[in-house]
Regions:
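HotDog/MaoC-like acyl-thioester-processing domains
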Residues: 1-3, 83-88, 92-135
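Hot-dog-fold acyl-thioester-processing enzymes
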Residues: 1-73
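Short, surface-exposed secondary-structure edge patches
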Residues: 44, 80-81
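Short alpha-helix capping/helix-loop boundary micro-motifs
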Residues: 74-79
Length: 135
């Protein structure tokens, strides 16, 4: 426990990623795709959809901690800083707990805390996740 895994690479978010994701998920909040509206907010430009950030950081963590596993759920999702098109995001994951599954022989449950960091090393998202993995 306490082991920390870092994604091998980061991912620069494109404006198109954000626009396509908001269209795909039918998110109609103009803060994500209307530059004129976003200019009137405290951020002055469109924010990346936070569920895109969650999906991206989860994906960046898969190779290191859950490539053969099944996601059981997220908890304690926090968004301490905004994400914008052009930001490069990477993931760091710390193992919090490991135990054998009580209901599935041959499997274990790992609980991790993952943080997404931008190119300035600011934490932009943090969450806990439980994963079912073969032993």
């Amino acid at each position: 426990m306490g082991a920390v895994y870092r994604s091998r690479f980061g991912r620069t978010i494109l404006e198109a990623d954000n626009v396509w994701f908001t269209l795909l998920t039918l998110n109609t909040n103009p803060i994500h795709f209307d530059a004129e509206y976003a200019a009137t907010t405290e951020w002055e430009r469109p924010l990346v959809d936070s569920t895109f950030t969650l999906a991206l950081v989860t994906g960046l963590s898969v190779e290191a901690v859950s490539e053969r596993g099944v996601n059981l759920g997220w908890r304690e999702v926090r968004l301490p800083a905004p994400v914008f098109a052009g930001d490069t995001i990477r993931a760091e994951t710390e193992v919090l707990e490991k135990r054998e599954s009580k209901s599935r022989p041959g499997f274990g449950i790992v609980t991790v805390r993952t943080r997404g960091l931008n190119q300035r090393d600011e934490v932009v998202i943090e969450f806990e996740r439980s994963i079912l993995l073969p032993l």
